[in-house]
């Protein structure tokens, strides 16, 4: 048998891992062929001329670095054939397994998300978010066990059949790695000039790692931005000026490079003072998880999806332009009750307002309300006289998972608990505030005990994919119909107990849900109608609220309604963001008529929903309507950042 030279192992690892990662990247991101919902595609000759050499050099550096580190670790034993086995097991075996784990996570979180967005989905905890993914990837543990058995089998074969080699036959060294890294510098700079090529390269681990190192080395002023960051630092030696910098009002400096020097106008509107009449009304707030605004009035196969909400809208007030500020439950819940985009812990909230006013407060939630600090931020648990949530009834959960981020109860359990404490008019002797949370429309849109309201087969969890879009949509609308049925049962109970006419009911959603529109499933990916428009229905026909309305406006609306005051004046826009206000991936405003203007802070691309125009901010013509809209967005973003500091 011929001797196995180490460079054969390097070549094998290079080809196998690159081909495997490329297949996964293409399947997830479609960076080569393009596809549904993908606008960043490497499809031009100039892009390929940058993409291919940059990818090959970065991947070669990654494989060679693994080889050299492992060789140093083996020391004198690096000439043994066992070293080749360990090298291939590390790069091909473990490397490919980690790639699968990464793309399993991205299948849930979407590539639009960074750590801040994952933390949002995990309720503020990266650890919880990780458990959220692992909950979906139990097979990875079995794969790891299989890999260990495969390694032991290969170990036995190598020890028996493969010869060792002389160290002199191993000419590769650290100087070769240094040469590859030096070559990567101009290639990374060239990629920055081709946004689609840069996007494609950033999906590959090797290039992302090399670029991260270059970004750190050239961040001279340590402001987090450099020559190699997605948002190139225009002032590399001035830590006060960089992308996402807080623009100081009126100092003559444009710190963030958008919209010129910020001029602060329009402070936060003070919350109305609660002035209760002699006989205060009760309040019932119902939050429907992942409930789209266009569910109201929709029919599927000739059947109405929301007959109960339709009736409530006819009798009361239906605000057709209501929007979440973000696409995540935890932050939305805080905004609904705290009356701010990012309420401060211990700050004003509906729970604290009504507790101080003498209300009896009950929380009946199909979700774990401590998740992500919702309860603590708005004083939910501390204010409640009655508190029942999914964590308290974990044994009755609707799905198998017991992790905090996945807990949910069937809505009928929520009704059962409500009935235990509210059986008749005597239980409403005091002014009462009830908060009910219904989880039915959350992914995977069904559970074993969910009733059927719409015809046709519903999708199993394993069948939720773009190829089954029609079935997935039907499953979602069935869950929305079940949510509506539950709302109808709550209204019926209020009427039966004689308190409906003295109760202000508010029904809304925490965010919307994409059903493969533009290639997305779920929420939190983009700022658009499907993922951020929510229903807002008030039982009081006199409370004529004009849109657009954001979740942070609800506290003021409710306090005015309970006080008998007129609703607040209409606002000019609702601010939205992905990430956090200070470090967003995307910011946007939605103006009357459902017109979105969004700014991607990585590419500096501004998108206009009504015209379909996409252009870099600096390419917008001065004095144009598009430039004015983009500047309104930039101004509102800066204003909201300063309001959050007040």
Residues of each region from the PLM?
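Polar, surface-exposed loop/tail segments
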Residues: 274, 502-503, 546-591
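Substrate-binding rim/cap in mid-to-C-terminal beta-strand-loop elements of soluble/periplasmic
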Residues: 319, 329-337, 393, 521-568
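Extracellular calcium-associated, cysteine-rich motifs in secreted modular proteins
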Residues: 195-275
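Transmembrane and membrane-interface helices of multi-pass
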Residues: 1-207, 218
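Active-site-proximal alpha/beta segments of enzymes that process anionic O-linked groups
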Residues: 212, 265, 269-285, 290-458
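Histidine-centered active-site microenvironments of extracellular/periplasmic hydrolases
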Residues: 268-275, 304, 450, 495-541, ...
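A long, amphipathic alpha-helix that forms part
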Residues: 409-426, 458-503, 561, 635-646
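Phosphate/adenylate-binding glycine loop and adjacent helical scaffold
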Residues: 570-646
């Amino acid at each position: 048998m011929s001797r196995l030279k180490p460079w054969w192992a390097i070549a094998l690892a290079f080809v196998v891992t690159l081909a495997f990662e490329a297949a996964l990247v293409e399947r997830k991101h479609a960076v080569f062929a393009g596809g549904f919902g993908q606008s960043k595609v490497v499809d031009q000759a100039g892009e390929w001329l940058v993409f291919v050499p940059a990818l090959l050099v970065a991947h070669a550096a990654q494989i060679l670095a693994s080889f050299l580190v492992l060789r140093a670790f083996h020391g004198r034993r690096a000439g043994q054939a066992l070293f080749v086995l360990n090298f291939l097991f590390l790069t091909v075996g473990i490397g490919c397994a980690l790639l699968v784990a990464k793309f399993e996570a991205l299948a849930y979180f979407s590539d639009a998300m960074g750590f801040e967005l994952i933390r949002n989905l995990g309720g503020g905890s990266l650890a919880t978010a990780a458990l959220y993914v692992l909950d979906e990837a139990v097979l990875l543990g079995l794969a790891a066990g299989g890999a260990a058995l495969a390694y032991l089998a290969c170990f036995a074969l190598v020890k028996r059949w493969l010869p060792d080699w002389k160290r002199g036959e191993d000419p590769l060294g650290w100087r070769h790695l240094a040469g590859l890294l030096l070559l990567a510098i101009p290639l990374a700079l060239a990629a920055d000039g081709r946004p689609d090529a840069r996007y494609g390269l950033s999906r590959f681990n090797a290039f992302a790692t090399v670029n991260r190192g270059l970004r750190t080395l050239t961040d001279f002023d340590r402001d987090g931005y450099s020559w190699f960051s997605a948002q190139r630092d225009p002032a590399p030696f001035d830590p006060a000026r960089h992308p996402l910098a807080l623009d100081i009002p009126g100092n003559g400096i444009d710190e963030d490079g958008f919209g010129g020097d910020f001029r602060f106008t329009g402070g936060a509107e003070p919350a109305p003072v609660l002035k209760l009449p002699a006989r205060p009304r009760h309040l019932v707030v119902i939050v429907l998880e992942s409930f789209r605004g266009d569910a109201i009035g929709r029919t599927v196969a000739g059947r109405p999806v929301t007959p109960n909400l339709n009736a409530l809208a006819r009798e009361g007030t239906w605000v057709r332009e209501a929007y979440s500020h973000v696409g995540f439950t935890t932050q939305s819940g805080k905004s609904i009750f705290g009356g701010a985009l990012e309420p401060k812990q211990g700050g004003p909230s509906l729970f604290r307002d009504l507790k101080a006013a003498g209300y009896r407060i009950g929380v009946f939630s199909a979700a774990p309300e401590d998740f992500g600090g919702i309860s603590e931020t708005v004083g939910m648990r501390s204010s409640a006289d009655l508190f029942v949530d999914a964590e308290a009834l974990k044994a009755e959960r609707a799905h198998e998972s017991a992790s905090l981020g996945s807990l949910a109860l069937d809505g009928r359990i929520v009704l059962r608990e409500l009935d235990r404490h509210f059986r008749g008019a005597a239980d409403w002797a005091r002014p009462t505030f009830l908060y009910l949370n219904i989880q039915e429309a959350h992914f995977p849109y069904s559970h074993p005990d969910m009733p059927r309201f719409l015809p046709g087969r519903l999708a199993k969890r394993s069948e939720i994919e773009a190829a089954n879009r029609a079935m997935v949509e039907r499953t979602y609308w069935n869950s929305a119909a079940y949510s509506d049925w539950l709302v109808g049962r709550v209204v019926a109970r209020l009427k039966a107990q004689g308190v409906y006419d003295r109760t202000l009911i508010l029904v809304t959603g925490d965010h919307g849900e994409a059903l493969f529109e533009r290639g997305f499933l779920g929420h939190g990916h983009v700022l658009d109608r499907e993922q951020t428009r929510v229903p807002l229905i008030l039982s009081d026909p006199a409370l004529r609220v004009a849109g657009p309305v954001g979740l942070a406006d609800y506290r003021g609306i409710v306090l005015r309604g309970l006080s008998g005051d007129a609703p607040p004046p209409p606002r000019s826009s609702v601010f939205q963001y992905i990430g956090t206000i200070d470090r967003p991936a995307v910011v946007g405003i939605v103006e009357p008529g459902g017109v979105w203007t969004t700014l991607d802070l990585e590419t500096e691309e501004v998108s206009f929903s009504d015209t379909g125009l996409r252009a870099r901010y600096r390419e917008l013509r001065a004095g144009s309507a598009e430039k004015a809209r983009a500047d309104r967005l930039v101004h509102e973003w800066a204003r909201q950042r300063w309001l959050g500091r007040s």
